[in-house]
Amino acid sequence: TQYSKKEEISTDSYQYLIGVSLPNVIEPWLNNFVDVFTEKVSQDKKINVIFRDAAGNPEKQIQDIETLMEYGIDILIVSPDGSDSLSSVLSEAFQKIPVILTGVGAGTEDYTCLIKSDDQKIGRLAGEYILNNLYEKNKKIVVFQGVEESPVSKQRLKGFQDSVQGTIPEEDITYYCGDWLRDRAELRMKDYLISHDSADIVFAFNDDMAYGAYQACQQYRIEGKVHLIGVDGFEGESAGLSLVDKGVLDATIQTPDFGGLSYEIARKLLEGNKVEKNIIIQPELILQGGAERKE
């Protein structure tokens, strides 16, 4: 990947050094995090950043954090993998410098700030949108979850299931794990279409998987008949907002700009300001033709 270039220290002179530890940058939201954070830092002469990608290996993420601490960083930003494996290394870091967590917690209260989305609400918004706008009796729904044990994926699933329970029969919903990846979702969608005539509605827990499902539908020439809902709502050529504008997705549920928010929180801390310990960002349903905020 191009990611290795971003692991280098990028500027010669700076006042503050930020270390960022990510569990697996292949996940689209973490890739977006890197892009946004890098862009912010490139415009800030006082700050430099070092990224470390654990590539899905929890042991490596612990080592990455220890290495970043050895570099003498001023702030540590970590996206945990959802387990408690980082709790002790984060506690050690927190004794010395501010620690910002993004996405999920890490089984410890030893952090300065946690930025997360209301993931149950994301699932609920999708379920309510499907019920109110798309679902009719006997319509078939395909749901693409993220990585099986991901807390984010579990929360989105709970929100969705709570919202449709008792209204949509279980036999009308098929669940797959797409592991957050476009290619995986495309393959699973093809598997589904081989054994079923068609699908009516797809809800994917990120826009990349929604687009993968769309590509499978294209190959079966049913793309115009299937309603697709994604999550993330990032900007970019094949990202969620663009896919909604083009009519590929019916809707996306926009999640926080983790890269931008993490940069702002880090900046405040470096300037000696206090920040909230827990920041929960409310999701927003984005439809074709504009945004519709749902409470």
Give a label for each model feature:
Residues 2-9, 148, 152, 164, ...:
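Hinge/cleft segment of the Venus flytrap/periplasmic-binding protein
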Residues 17-36, 50-59, 80-83, 148-154, ...:
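Extracytoplasmic "Venus flytrap"
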Residues 29-43, 47, 122-126, 151-169, ...:
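Short, solvent-exposed amphipathic alpha-helices that sit
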Residues 76-93, 160, 173-174, 178-239:
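Hydrophobic alpha-helical
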